Structures are given as C-alpha cells and as structure tokens.
Amino acid sequence: FSLNSGQTLFVPGGVIENKPIIQTQFIAQIQAGVRGSSNFIWPTSGGITQYPVVYHMALDIANPSSPPVLAADSGTVVYAGCLNWGYGCNVIIDHGNGYQSLYAHLSSYSVEAGNSVGQGSQIGVMGSTGRSTGMHLHFEIRSGGVLLNPLSFLK
C-alpha cells in the first residue's frame, strides 16, 4: 500500500476536526479622522493588525463593524475599481504633492477616477475583497512609485 502526495485518504468512521477560529489580535487602536504629524489623517477606525515591515510596507486596520474609509488627505482619485485578486476593490488618490495613498480590500467604493476628494470625505467601506484574510483596510502611502511607511505620516 502506498500513499501519494495529493491523494485523498478516506477513513471509515473518521471525524474531521473543525479548524479553530482565531480571534484577530489588535496591536493598537486608532480613530478615523485624527490628524497625524503631517497632513494625513487616519483613514478609518479600528485596530492595527499588521504594522509596516519590509515585505508589507502598509498598515492593516481591522474592524468587524465595517466602518467607512476616509480620504487621508485631499486630492484626485486616479483609480477606483475591483480586482479579483491582490488589492480587491481599491481606491488610489493622488494628493498633488508627490504622494499617493491606496485603500485596499474595500467592500464598496463611492468615488470614480477623476473625482476630487476632500480630506476626511468618505471614499468607501472597509471590506475583505481580493487576497484578504478578513475584514480590514490595507493602507499604503507612495511617492514616486516607492512604498513609504504610513506611520511616518500618521504618528
């Protein structure tokens, strides 16, 4: 008898254990609309579940109540759409000062490319679209195509 990789094994009378549900661990709580040391404000309310690191230069902010997502600063929407992978439904705002902000995994968005948005205006709703592990906002700040640490702008 041999068992090959990928082969399904059926055990009569066997029981499949349910996978444990792992609660999201909030590293820190933040409040939408609170201004950081630069012009950017926090884009939503919730708990930080992932800080920026070399392989993930973004903030992940989770909140099971699916709160609104706000423009971190004024600017022009350069992209608003949905992908079946990666960022899922997302919005990119060009702030006209060399910076862009990206808001990903939205359940819905309320802006279109070309729209002008004011700081703090609602651009969407937190979701779990694309390649996502649960309800959260993936928030990036970019300059010249380079991802920057959002905390440098929000602290």
Regions found by a protein language model. Give the residues of each.
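Short, low-complexity, Pro/Ser/Thr/Gly-rich segments in the mature regions of secreted, periplasmic
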Residues: 143-155
